[in-house]
């Protein structure tokens, strides 16, 4: 039996909605209403929030943004299949310079073979290496210390403890990976 014959029989057995049915027209009308604004004009573009309002509490932040990257952030980007450089650019709408401290590199090397891809990404030439003068310090302590000294950095991490420590420092934005996207945590409205 040919395909045309079976489709005719299907239409006879099952009730098929006609294309001119009112139920389908109501859905189309709802879609058209969503496209228009209150004034009846078409929405052609959505205004973008000015970046200077977002970073109003920290005047040393500005493009190109220097982003200190933690070990967790690289691993989560790999798990979520996000390109680190493109993700940062699309998130911040500006040129970004990802920075990795020597402590983070040492932490990646200690993790061993399982995290060799993350180590290979961290050794990329596009990353700016931040030399550490201290010896044998925990990577989170190194990041917090560097951010407290120079408030020109954004911090990219998924570590809950590090996020809590950085939230106590006013004016430092935190980037994290969630739902296959890199997101910026909202800055505190009032700085003490």
Curated annotation (Swiss-Prot):
Which keywords describe this protein according to UniProt? Nucleus, Ribosome biogenesis, rRNA processing
Give residue ranges for domain PINc: 65-164
* Entry GO MF terms: RNA endonuclease activity
Give the UniProt subcellular location, in the record's own words.
Nucleus, Nucleolus
Chief location of this protein within or outside the cell: nucleus
One GO cellular component this record assigns the protein to is: small-subunit processome
Q: InterPro entries in the record, alphabetically?
A: Fcf1/Utp23, Fcf1_PIN, PIN-like_dom_sf, PIN_dom
Q: Say if the entry is tagged with keyword Nucleus.
A: yes
Q: What does this protein do?
A: Essential protein involved in pre-rRNA processing and 40S ribosomal subunit assembly. Required for the early cleavage steps of 35S rRNA at the A(0), A(1), and A(2) sites.
- Family recorded in the similarity comment: Belongs to the UTP23/FCF1 family. FCF1 subfamily.
Q: Which PANTHER family match?
A: RRNA-PROCESSING PROTEIN UTP23 HOMOLOG
The name of this protein is rRNA-processing protein fcf1
Q: Which organism is it from?
A: Schizosaccharomyces pombe (strain 972 / ATCC 24843) (Fission yeast)
Identify the taxonomic lineage of the organism of origin: Eukaryota, Fungi, Dikarya, Ascomycota, Taphrinomycotina
